[in-house]
Structure formats: structure tokens, C-alpha cells
């Protein structure tokens, strides 16, 4: 006796596997958690629920990886649509457009710009990150063209995370060191 099914059981499973493979293949490589920067040191306050901590860490890792790669998709994923820069530098546009423009400017001057997350601290709805930037000034910044000099400076950011995205950012960069390395100040 033979039993016939109106459809093959293997066909739906094959379709699911094929669909999943397509989705993974279409994702930008750095959008997968395994491809994001890991902090060298991570401290999470004991009173932060695990699910909340994971979402906050993911947003901060995406944003750190954006600074490391220049991948605008990561910034758009990490930042809330109504993102506010609370320490907005003069001339920088408010909102998501601000960091995108800043990254483009930095990469025009320092094409091999690399960022590490040295420390990350999660407390309440805040994440504090200590970033370390390195590269070589081989491009142009304002009217100055680099001659390959090394760039090595730090920044510290405080993010307020809302619904898994960075809603606000307070940041300070060691701009004096950066400007000296660029040869713009003595």
C-alpha cells in the first residue's frame, strides 16, 4: 500500500532554507552581530534587565562599527529616526545626517580610519563608550592634504537608548590631538 501526499514535505522545508539563505546573503555583512565590533571591556549594571542590556549593547556596537567602517546602513540602524546630538559641533547638521557627514569628512581625510571600542558601560538607559581611532592622514581635510602621518585619538560618548536605538548622544573627542596630528595646529 502506498500513501500519496498532495505535496512533498521536503518542498516546504527546502523553501524555508532557501529563503533564510537569501535573507542572510542580502544582509550587509556588518549588520550581523558576529561582524560588529566587540568592546574590549564591558560593564553592565546589575539592575539592567538582560534583554534591555543586549539591545543597548547591540545599538552601541552597531554605531561603533559604523565609525570603524563608514557603513551608513549601520548608523541608520543604530540611531533613532529622531536622533539628537546634544553636543552638536558648529556647522554639523542635527539628526542622523550629522554623523553620516562627519564620517564622510573623516574618511576623506583618513581613508584607513579604524575605530575600537575600548570600554563600554551600560547603566539604566545609558551606554558610555570609550572609542579609540587610528589611521593615516593621506587624504584632504579642509584645504590641507595629508602626507601619510599617523592619526591616533580618542573619544567618549554617552548614548541614551530608547527602543533599541540611540536617541541622544553626548560626546567629546580629543580634537586638539587630532588637529595637531593633521598639522592644523602647533
Predicted regions and their residues:
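Bacterial N-terminal signal peptides that target proteins for export
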Residues: 3-18
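Residue-level detector of alpha-helical transmembrane segments in integral membrane proteins
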Residues: 5, 21-22, 104
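Bacterial N-terminal signal peptides
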Residues: 14-28
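Short, low-complexity N-terminal intrinsically disordered segments enriched in polar/charged residues
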Residues: 33-77, 81, 185
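A beta-strand edge to alpha-helix "cap/lid" segment located at domain peripheries
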Residues: 34-52, 100-186
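A solvent-exposed, acidic/Ser-Thr-rich amphipathic alpha-helical stretch
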Residues: 58, 72-124
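Conserved short-loop catalytic and cofactor-binding motifs
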Residues: 63, 87-90, 147
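Residues at alpha-helix boundaries and the short loops/turns that link adjacent helices
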Residues: 66-69, 89, 172
Amino acid at each position: 500500500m502506498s500513501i500519496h501526499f498532495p505535496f512533498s514535505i521536503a518542498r516546504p522545508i527546502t523553501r524555508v532554507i532557501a529563503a533564510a539563505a537569501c535573507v542572510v546573503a542580502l544582509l550587509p555583512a556588518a549588520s550581523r552581530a558576529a561582524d560588529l565590533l566587540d568592546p574590549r571591556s564591558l560593564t553592565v549594571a546589575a539592575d539592567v534587565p538582560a534583554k534591555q542590556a543586549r539591545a543597548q549593547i547591540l545599538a552601541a556596537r552597531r554605531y561603533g562599527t559604523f565609525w570603524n567602517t563608514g557603513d551608513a546602513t549601520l548608523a541608520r540602524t543604530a540611531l533613532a529616526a529622531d536622533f539628537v546630538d546634544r553636543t552638536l559641533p558648529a556647522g554639523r547638521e542635527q539628526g542622523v545626517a550629522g554623523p553620516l557627514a562627519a564620517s564622510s569628512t573623516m574618511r576623506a581625510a583618513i581613508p584607513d580610519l579604524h575605530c575600537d571600542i575600548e570600554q563600554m558601560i551600560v547603566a539604566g538607559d545609558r551606554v558610555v563608550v570609550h572609542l579609540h581611532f587610528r589611521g593615516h592622514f593621506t587624504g584632504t581635510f579642509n584645504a590641507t592634504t595629508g602626507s601619510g602621518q599617523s592619526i591616533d585619538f580618542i573619544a567618549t560618548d554617552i548614548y541614551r537608548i530608547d527602543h533599541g536605538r540611540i536617541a541622544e548622544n553626548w560626546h567629546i573627542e580629543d580634537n586638539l590631538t587630532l588637529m595637531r596630528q593633521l598639522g592644523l595646529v602647533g
